Amino acid sequence: MAKKSMIEREKKRKKLVEKYAEKRRELKEQFMKAEDLEQKIELHRQIQRLPRNSAPSRVRNRCWLTGRPRGFYRDFGLSRNVIREMAHEGLLPGVVKSSW
């Protein structure tokens, strides 16, 4: 299980990403449309002034059950270990052990 502080930090980052997503998107659109170099530089500065943790690339996918950051499967939102345990117990509908 991941440290609770790390899990809480990720939750805080997700909230910041949601909060600034619209503003970041608008600034990027303006940046792409801008033709003047000075205008582009100013828009770039405005983007840089946004909180660092409001960038979507700062968010790490974590298992919602254990908080494990590695071995994460997006389809389930779980780590590989939890998927294996839950599949063996029959808690994931439609998931069967492969055999060939």
Swiss-Prot record:
The record's Gene Ontology cellular component field reads: cytoplasm; small ribosomal subunit
- GO MF annotations, alphabetized: rRNA binding; structural constituent of ribosome
Cite the Pfam families for this sequence: Ribosomal_S14
Q: Does the keyword Membrane apply?
A: no
InterPro entries membership: Ribosomal_uS14, Ribosomal_uS14_bac/plastid, Ribosomal_uS14_CS
Q: Which UniProt keywords apply?
A: Ribonucleoprotein, Ribosomal protein, RNA-binding, rRNA-binding
Q: Which GO terms describe its biological process?
A: translation
Give the protein's biological function.
Binds 16S rRNA, required for the assembly of 30S particles and may also be responsible for determining the conformation of the 16S rRNA at the A site.
- Which HAMAP family does the UniProt record give? Ribosomal_uS14_1
The record's section on PANTHER family has: 30S RIBOSOMAL PROTEIN S14, SMALL RIBOSOMAL SUBUNIT PROTEIN US14M
**Family per record:** Belongs to the universal ribosomal protein uS14 family.
Q: How does it assemble?
A: Part of the 30S ribosomal subunit. Contacts proteins S3 and S10.
Its recorded name reads Small ribosomal subunit protein uS14
**Species this chain originates from:** Trichodesmium erythraeum (strain IMS101)
Originating gene: rpsN
